[in-house]
């Protein structure tokens, strides 16, 4: 009698990982503690995911939940705040009430012992003083990380079971602040207790990168500088800061997206084959390739900031970044960045890795585009286009390979077409869990494969800290671009200068995400 839980466990780990430290203790009580339970992340992401796990019987049977925040709330008020995001069907109402009956809430400060002592008393009461495992999710601003983690360590740790701490980015602002945070956490917890969450590592196609690379001879044998001309990793959003202007203006697009999400994807694309699928073997290879990346310089970057479109049909479309009331009028914070990274190793020497991200662009899209070299000895009068392997992360997961074929008919014309694996078509009846679902389940199972280790962080900040400090020190003005555009034209020129060819002649037809825009 296989339950959904059995199936998810099989998908999360190999059988050998039980003896390598990855466990799913189905019969032991688990308590999931949400710090910042009154915040947006909790109501929009964390509580909905926990409800879906409970609904689908994916959690250990003796799991309970406890929220903690400064706000004077009750479980009923949190339940009301979360309702729009919970997706409860009418026939699930009974089970939904059962889920909330397993919840408690404690109000307290983050900078004192009293609230945490009350929290620990509540946890012991919920666990009936039995052996229990505890997961602490810090959905909190970084300003309170240190106080909260000290109080967790001193007051709230399970004595008999294991303890795991989930931490949200940002993991510092630069190499010094990130290292200070890592040193602080290392003094309190073992690395195997820390789960630094980068939700992009939980996305279906990002997790598929290893299989695509190392499970297919046709790709693995061409995955090198002899065959690949350039790699373009893109993250585009059609919307702006949406109420996060204050936070975003402090951190900017490089810290918010490029230094973490895009660099993590790059490490999966560029790393060497690990000796096994054990989490630490994979993370070891990620660190090795990050160590081979040269520090980013200003000559390899384009920075942009969006303007409102005077012809926009809504107030939002007509509003530029600095017109956001939460943003300084003279802000130099980039909302668009393109950076060219160079990997100094045998496999990738001379292949540009172009990272591109921006807000208020022409579409929502995240993808990896592997562009192959031109065909040598062209016999088709220059009509061939480069082959491309495109891994679409969102929206609409897909994998397609652009190639040249003869056009149907009596002529001998050639055209671009694709070998297409669009998940929407190939896996019609499959449910693709979202990133937070996968990653929270990984924490229950103890799999750190898709979480960021401290040495990965150190190398990531080494690459980006000098350019971030230079931008701030020299008050470098970003190039302006209009709402709804593809971004600064200078970015297209830099792509071209770095051996990425874009003809604009091809339109992918694979599903709803079809577009001719790069």
UniProtKB/Swiss-Prot annotation:
D-glucose 6-phosphate binds at residues 169, 199-203, 237, 256, 359, 364, 394. Gene3D superfamilies: Dihydrodipicolinate Reductase, domain 2, NAD(P)-binding Rossmann-like Domain. SUPFAM superfamilies: Glyceraldehyde-3-phosphate dehydrogenase-like, C-terminal domain, NAD(P)-binding Rossmann-fold domains. GO terms for molecular function: glucose-6-phosphate dehydrogenase activity; NADP binding. It catalyses: D-glucose 6-phosphate + NADP(+) = 6-phospho-D-glucono-1,5-lactone + NADPH + H(+). NADP(+) 1 binds at residues 36-43, 70, 169. Its main location: cytoplasm. Signal peptide: none annotated. GO terms for cellular component: cytosol. NADP(+) 2 binds at residues 356, 365, 369, 392, 400-402, 420-422, 486, 502, 508. It is found in: Cytoplasm, Cytosol. Its EC number is 1.1.1.49. The active site is at residue 261. Pathway: Carbohydrate degradation; pentose phosphate pathway; D-ribulose 5-phosphate from D-glucose 6-phosphate (oxidative stage): step 1/3. Keywords: Carbohydrate metabolism, Cytoplasm, Glucose metabolism, NADP, Oxidoreductase. It is an enzyme of class 1 (oxidoreductase). GO terms for biological process: glucose 6-phosphate metabolic process; glucose metabolic process; NADP metabolic process; pentose-phosphate shunt, oxidative branch. Cytosolic glucose-6-phosphate dehydrogenase that catalyzes the first and rate-limiting step of the oxidative branch within the pentose phosphate pathway/shunt, an alternative route to glycolysis for the dissimilation of carbohydrates and a major source of reducing power and metabolic intermediates for fatty acid and nucleic acid biosynthetic processes. Belongs to the glucose-6-phosphate dehydrogenase family. This is Glucose-6-phosphate 1-dehydrogenase. It comes from Drosophila yakuba (Fruit fly).
């Amino acid at each position: 009698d296989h339950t959904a839980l059995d199936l998810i466990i099989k998908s999360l780990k190999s059988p050998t990982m039980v003896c390598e430290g990855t466990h799913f203790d189905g019969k032991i009580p688990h308590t999931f503690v949400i710090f910042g339970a009154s915040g947006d992340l909790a109501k929009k992401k964390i509580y909905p995911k926990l409800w879906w796990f409970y609904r689908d019987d994916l959690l250990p049977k003796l799991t309970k939940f406890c929220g903690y925040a400064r706000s004077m709330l009750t479980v009923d008020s949190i339940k009301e705040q979360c309702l729009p995001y919970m997706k409860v069907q009418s026939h699930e109402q009974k089970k939904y009430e059962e889920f909330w009956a397993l919840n408690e809430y404690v109000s307290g400060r983050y900078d004192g012992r009293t609230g945490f002592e009350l929290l620990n008393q509540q946890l012991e009461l919920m666990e009936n003083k039995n052996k229990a495992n505890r997961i602490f999710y810090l959905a909190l601003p970084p300003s309170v990380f240190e106080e909260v983690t000290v109080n967790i360590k001193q007051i709230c740790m399970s004595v008999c079971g294991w303890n795991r701490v989930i931490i949200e980015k940002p993991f510092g602002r630069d190499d010094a602040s990130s290292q200070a945070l890592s040193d602080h956490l290392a003094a309190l917890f073992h690395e195997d207790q820390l789960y630094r969450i980068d939700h992009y590592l939980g996305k279906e196609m990002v997790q598929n990168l290893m299989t695509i690379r190392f499970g297919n001879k046709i790709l693995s044998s061409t995955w090198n500088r002899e065959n690949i001309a350039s790699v373009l990793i893109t993250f585009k959003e059609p919307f702006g800061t949406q109420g996060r202007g204050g936070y975003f203006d402090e951190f900017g697009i490089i810290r918010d997206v490029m230094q973490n999400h895009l660099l993590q994807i790059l490490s999966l694309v560029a790393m060497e084959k690990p000796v096994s699928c054990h989490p630490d073997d994979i993370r070891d290879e990620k660190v090795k390739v990050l160590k081979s990346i040269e520090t980013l310089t200003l000559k390899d970057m384009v920075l942009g900031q969006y303007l409102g479109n005077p012809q926009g049909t809504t107030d939002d479309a007509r509003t530029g970044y600095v017109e956001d009331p939460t943003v300084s009028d003279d802000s130099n914070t980039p909302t668009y960045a393109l950076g060219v990274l160079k990997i100094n190793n045998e496999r990738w020497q001379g292949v540009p890795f172009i990272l591109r991200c921006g807000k208020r662009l022409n579409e929502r899209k995240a993808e990896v585009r592997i562009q192959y070299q031109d065909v040598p000895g062209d016999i088709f009068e220059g009509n061939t286009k480069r082959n491309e392997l495109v891994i679409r992360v969102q929206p609409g997961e897909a994998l397609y390979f652009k190639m040249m074929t003869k056009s149907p008919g009596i002529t001998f014309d050639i055209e671009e077409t694709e070998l297409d694996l669009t998940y929407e078509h190939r896996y019609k009846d499959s449910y693709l869990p979202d990133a937070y679902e996968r990653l929270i389940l990984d924490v229950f199972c103890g799999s750190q494969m898709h979480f960021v280790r401290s040495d990965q962080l150190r190398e990531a900040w080494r690459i980006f800290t000098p350019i971030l400090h230079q931008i701030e020190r020299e008050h470098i003005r970003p190039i302006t671009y209009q709402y709804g555009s593809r971004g600064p034209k200078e970015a297209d020129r830099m792509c071209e200068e770095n051996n990425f060819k874009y003809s604009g002649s091809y339109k992918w037809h694979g599903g709803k995400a079809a577009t001719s825009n790069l």
